[in-house]
Amino acid sequence: MLNEFIAIRRELHQIPETGYKELKTQAYLLDYISKLPSGHLEVKKWRTGILVLVKGTNPEKTIGYRTDIDALPITEETELPFASKHPGNMHACGHDLHMSIALGVLTHFASKPAKDNLLFVFQPAEEGPGGAKPIMESTEFAEWRPDSIYGLHIAPEYKVGEIAIKPGLLFANTSELFISFKGKGGHAAYPHLANDMVVAASAFVGQMQTIISRNIDPMDSAVITIGRIHGGEIQNVIAETAYLDGTIRTLSPETMEIVWTRLKQLAKGWEEAYQCEVEFHPGSDYYQVDNDPVETEEFIHFLEEQYPESYVPARSAMTGEDFGYFLSEIKGFMFWLGVDSEYSLHHAKLNPKEEAIPFAIDVLIHFLESK
């Protein structure tokens, strides 16, 4: 018989929605939650997200658990029988698994409340524009603000049954990067009468990499990736505009500041050298996921005692996750959950092993009961 929460994952997988558009997802979650024993539950909506408080039997504190609920604008290529029914959208980062795990844990505690309050945060817009910071600033969250908070993220590179975690920095600081170049278009036969923005933008892509190699301490780490370039409209017209979209990832906020300062300095030079306008457009910023050392060591000890084959020491990764905003103010941690997939996160063929769902539910129930 198919595990109930694997079945839920498959249903959620078919209705992927991007940030702040998770209307069907929110409705699905609310419908499921409405069928749980309600004696200890309080539910609030926040935009397209949900907060659920499970009142404890003798509460002295509130423990938070956060899951993200949004999907990515990716066309799915898995050919699964439960593939996305929303063309151009896919749960390619595992948030469908994250939600089903959270529902599994919530279901248990709705029937068997813990001593302390438990707050379940179903957060929208993790992939962009970033939902963690605004939900934290909401009055809904403030009323139930937890004393500690936890979360997980699936990891294709780890096996099912493995949990990877480390104290301190787990995920990097991440900034989205959107740059526009505006010059003067013209006929391809007369380049001397135009300012070619394809040339300007292309040269900028190469030059910005010197920030990493020449302005960042070699013992530190940072990466600038340009994932999309667009310039011009037709083959025989010199492009008047060009656009670069990408990300910056660093291991500290200070290094992020260095990268941004140098990018803006380079842009001023580009305006002079290429007789153009260079403009930076706002995107999402993701604060580093910095695991609380005491909380993390407590969880590692729990794993070693209860799941001795599961614990794997993690390494810091350049991945971005807005859960870092929670951890910047509230003690807690995030861990990697092994799902053993051939394809990486954000890949159109990502197909996590679903056995990780009941395993994660079991681990989280026992851990939260131990708190």
Curated annotation (Swiss-Prot):
Reaction catalysis annotation: N-acetyl-(2S,6S)-2,6-diaminopimelate + H2O = (2S,6S)-2,6-diaminopimelate + acetate
KW Amino-acid biosynthesis (keyword) present: yes
InterPro entries found in the cross-reference section: AcetylDAP_deacetylase (IPR023905), Amidohydrolase (IPR017439), Bact_exopeptidase_dim_dom (IPR036264), Peptidase_M20 (IPR002933), Peptidase_M20_dimer (IPR011650)
Pfam families on file: M20_dimer, Peptidase_M20
Pathway membership, UniProt: Amino-acid biosynthesis; L-lysine biosynthesis via DAP pathway; LL-2,6-diaminopimelate from (S)-tetrahydrodipicolinate (acetylase route): step 3/3
Record-linked SUPFAM superfamilies: Bacterial exopeptidase dimerisation domain (SSF55031), Zn-dependent exopeptidases (SSF53187)
Entry's Gene Ontology molecular function annotations: N-acetyldiaminopimelate deacetylase activity
Protein role: Catalyzes the conversion of N-acetyl-diaminopimelate to diaminopimelate and acetate.
Listed name of the protein: N-acetyldiaminopimelate deacetylase
Gene source species: Listeria monocytogenes serovar 1/2a (strain ATCC BAA-679 / EGD-e)
